[in-house]
């Protein structure tokens, strides 16, 4: 059995070991968040160091969001304005008062 060496890229999260997610795959993740009752929000940052806890929020969390398409539209808008930044979608649980899900949907120089 031969082992494959991964390219020397910085890994950020579980999904970073996969090829970049398509809009359809991102929509499926967002749909899961909405079904769980989490409020989606979009954040961006110039760097994606694991030590950086504070990202800039893109607008306000989408509290009234009912469809993944609404979030995808905001992701596209954020990509067009901050294409040189990392962009992630996060899910906020207002009962536990914490972020429960987050994944990167855009890496600079990738799309």
Curated annotation (Swiss-Prot):
Keyword Oxidoreductase: no
Use of this protein: Heterologous expression of 12 carboxysomal genes in E.coli (ccaA, ccmK2, ccmK3, ccmK4, ccmL, ccmM, ccmN, ccmO, ccmP, rbcL, rbcS, rbcX) leads to the formation of bodies that resemble carboxysomes, have densely packed paracrystalline arrays and RuBisCO activity. These structures open the door to generating carboxysomes in plant cells to increase their photosynthesis and productivity, as well as tailoring bacterial microcompartments to specific metabolic needs and molecule delivery.
Pfam entry (one): RuBisCO_small
Gene induction: Carboxysome size and components vary with growth conditions. When grown in ambient air at medium light (50 uE meter(-2) second(-1)) there are 853 RuBisCO complexes (RbcL8S8) per carboxysome, the numbers decrease under low light and high CO(2), and increase under high light (at protein level).
GO biological process, one term: reductive pentose-phosphate cycle
Keyword Mitochondrion among UniProt keywords: no
InterPro entries: RuBisCO_ssu (IPR024681), RuBisCO_ssu_dom (IPR000894), RuBisCO_ssu_sf (IPR036385)
UniProt GO molecular function: ribulose-bisphosphate carboxylase activity
One Gene Ontology term, aspect cellular component: carboxysome
Additional information: RuBisCO folding and assembly commences when the nascent large subunit folds with the help of chaperonin GroEL-GroES. Both RbcX and Raf1 help folded RbcL release from the chaperonin and dimerize; dimeric Raf1 binds to RbcL(2) leading to an RbcL8-Raf1(8) complex. RbcS displaces Raf1, resulting in holoenzyme formation.
Family membership noted in the UniProt record: Belongs to the RuBisCO small chain family.
Role played: RuBisCO catalyzes two reactions: the carboxylation of D-ribulose 1,5-bisphosphate, the primary event in carbon dioxide fixation, as well as the oxidative fragmentation of the pentose substrate in the photorespiration process. Both reactions occur simultaneously and in competition at the same active site.
Protein name per its UniProtKB record: Ribulose bisphosphate carboxylase small subunit
Source organism: Synechococcus elongatus (strain ATCC 33912 / PCC 7942 / FACHB-805)
Lineage per the UniProt record: Bacteria, Bacillati, Cyanobacteriota, Cyanophyceae, Synechococcales
Gene that this sequence comes from: cbbS
């Amino acid at each position: 059995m031969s082992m494959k060496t991964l390219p020397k890229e910085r890994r950020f999260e579980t999904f970073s070991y996969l090829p970049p997610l398509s809009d359809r795959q991102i929509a499926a993740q967002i749909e899961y968040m909405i079904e769980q009752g989490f409020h989606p929000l979009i954040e961006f940052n110039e760097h994606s160091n694991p030590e950086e806890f504070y990202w800039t929020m893109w607008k306000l969390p989408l509290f009234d969001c009912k469809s993944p398409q609404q979030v995808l539209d905001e992701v596209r808008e954020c990509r067009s304005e901050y294409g040189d930044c990392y962009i992630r979608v996060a899910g906020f649980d207002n009962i536990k008062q914490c972020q429960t899900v987050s994944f990167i949907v855009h890496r600079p120089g990738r799309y």
